[in-house]
Amino acid sequence: MTNYEEIKQGLADYEAKVAKANAKFPERKEFKEKHVYTPLDVEGFDYCSKSGFPGQYPFTRGVQPTMYRGRLWTMRAYAGFATAEETNARYKYLLEAGQTGLSVAMDLPTQIGLDSDAELSHGEVGKVGVAIDSLADMEKLFEGIPLDKVSTSMTINGPAAVLLAMYVAVAEQQGVKPEQLKGTIQNDILKEYIARGTYIFPPRPSMRLITDTFEYCSKSIPKWNTISVGAYHIREAGASCVQEIAFAFANAMAYICLLYTSDAADD
């Protein structure tokens, strides 16, 4: 059994011994961290409700009871280039090689909602990802790939709702119901305004489009991950490692706050 009185005395002795050494290091006022933590810091801690067991709510120890041994993480290489037909061939090769999911890279015109024949698209079509202009392109992209067997991640933000609608339409053509689909859309528009710049609409309507996507997926595509909040892009745009985390969490909180004021809050 833990002897809290003994720990208190031991902690006091420790702090007295290292006080002079610790004084050499400046403390950051915004953080009230301690130099050492003990069971005293979790005295009265409700293990079941705050930590829980692996695979059980609140999932602080993983969503699978036996971690990756129960279910391996999805293996997916970020891929997409040139035309939908060429990328489709690449996807089939990756799946045959053992990949267990798809990660779709879109070209810049697609990311900002431009057709490949638009004047602003000149020189960028198919360069950093696949060009998707229409439902026909999406059909070619996933031709021969059973969407009820493979999960798909699409790194797309501004037109995320449109690309998701196309994906659902292709699945329905395959006879796959929306509720059978599994995957992710990045759908993190706020980091586009502050880091990457591939946005289409002003912030307010863009945020509304995101919460509408949340609501639709909660009712029609329950296995779909409706957002993947990005931090890496913010760091690459010049943020420090601390700012990277801070801004990403601030963005996530903004989505949650807006969600609570929408019709999708209950879901």
Region roles according to the model:
Residues 99, 121-259:
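Active-site cavity-forming subdomains of large catalytic enzyme subunits
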Residues 260-267:
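Conserved small/polar residues in nucleotide/adenosyl-binding loops
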Residues 1-136, 141-148, 173-174:
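Acidic/polar, glycine-rich intrinsically disordered N-terminal extensions of enzymes
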Residues 15-20, 157, 240, 262:
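Short, structured coil/loop segments at alpha-helix boundaries
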